[in-house]
A protein has these predicted regions:
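Gly/Ala-rich phosphate-binding loop of Rossmann-like dinucleotide-binding domains
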Residues: 11, 15, 107-108, 131
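N-terminal Rossmann-fold NAD(P) dinucleotide-binding loop
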Residues: 7-8
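C-terminal helix-to-coil terminal segments
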Residues: 39-43, 114, 119-167
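Residues at the starts of beta-strands that form the adenosine-phosphate
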Residues: 16-20
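Rossmann-like adenosine-cofactor binding region
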Residues: 26-128
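Short beta-strand "acidic-cap" motif of Rossmann-like dinucleotide-binding folds
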Residues: 21-25
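Glycine-rich Rossmann-fold phosphate-binding loop(s) that bind the pyrophosphate
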Residues: 1-4
Length: 167
């Protein structure tokens, strides 16, 4: 859910692992995902965006790569209810995108098998219930702290400045 740069990178890895990828994005109707193999071969897959409902109903793994734009969670009890029994959800997007109470309820009742979170509604201190739950894996949101990520941010900023002054 969310099929921009990060969502497409996750899709690339999922396809490489043999998974069928479903995507939902308000702004991207389709994307071409190219896998580069060790022998120089390339294979491109076109992934078309579908409805949120289709993604939730059809996925064993749901990953979130969306901004937090509203006060309401994007994934709440209703959305979790659409998900496959035993599915898992991964949020590396923003805290508050998932209703944590609805998530805990679904995990406790066995609707969902697991959750992986590196962002929380109450950052930097997730609730004790999240931290202690056996079916939730928590990690710090530090993906942008790598040297490669910082280099990419610098390059993107420089490109935007150059593009601005070339207008």
């Amino acid at each position: 859910i969310g099929f921009g740069r990060i969502g497409q990178e996750v899709a690339k890895r999922a396809i490489g692992l043999g998974m069928n990828v479903l995507a939902h994005d308000k702004y991207t109707s389709e994307a071409n995902i190219t896998l580069n193999f060790f022998n120089g071969d390339k294979k491109t897959f076109t992934i078309e965006s579908t409805s949120l409902k289709n993604v939730l109903k059809g996925s064993d793994f749901v990953t979130l790569h969306i901004p937090k734009l509203e006060d309401k969670a994007v994934i709440g009890a209703e959305e979790i209810g659409l998900m496959k029994d035993g599915a898992g959800i991964i949020n590396t997007a923003r805290g508050g995108v998932i209703d944590e109470d609805a998530l805990m309820f679904a995990l406790d009742k066995g609707k969902l098998a697991y959750a992986a979170l590196d962002v929380f509604t109450n950052e930097p201190n997730p609730s004790i219930h999240l931290m202690m739950h056996n079916n939730i894996s928590l990690t710090p949101h530090i993906g942008a702290a790598t040297l490669e990520a910082q280099d990419r941010i610098g390059e993107e900023l420089a490109e935007k400045i150059i593009a601005y002054f070339n207008k």
